[in-house]
From Swiss-Prot:
This is UPF0146 protein PH0209. NCBIfam families: PRK04148.1. Gene3D superfamilies: Vaccinia Virus protein VP39. It comes from Pyrococcus horikoshii (strain ATCC 700860 / DSM 12428 / JCM 9974 / NBRC 100139 / OT-3). It comes from the Archaea. Transmembrane segments: none annotated. Belongs to the UPF0146 family.
């Protein structure tokens, strides 16, 4: 999944990027941070956010189904790695409200919302929406 960090860092060179639904997998966020990106991870699970903070990653508890828009202020992009299918439409809705790019790496077989473009990067299917 490090490839996801590569393409995001290549396309969004600076500024704040937010990973939504981070869980306990921090490799993409760590790689983006190493690239000089201001990374923020978000999850509804407080334990996941505490884990991220212990790893030196900024994290905030939030619910994608009722997002606190102030958290995403000044974000240049949002992304999600293998989000649950029911999260995909709210992710796209948030990106549209914020008018920023959205990157989703779905689980194999999951359908992404209409209007997202497939980027096949080093064998990883990454779906992107941009305003």
């Amino acid at each position: 999944m490090i490839e996801v960090a590569e393409i995001i860092a290549r396309e969004i060179r600076r500024g704040k990027i937010v990973e939504i639904g981070v869980g306990f997998y921090l490799e993409v966020a760590k790689r983006l941070r190493e690239s000089g990106i201001d990374i923020l991870v978000v999850d509804i699970n407080e334990k996941a956010i505490n884990y991220a903070r212990k790893q030196g990653i900024k994290g905030v508890v939030d619910d994608i189904f009722n997002p606190t828009l102030g958290i995403y202020k000044d974000a240049k992009a949002i992304y999600s790695i293998r989000p649950a299918p029911e999260m995909m439409k709210p992710l796209l809705d948030l990106a549209r409200k914020l008018k920023i790019p959205l990157y989703i790496v779905p689980l194999t077989g999951d359908r992404t919302p209409n209007g997202m473009k497939l980027i096949n990067y080093k064998g990883i299917p990454i779906y992107k929406w941009e305003p």
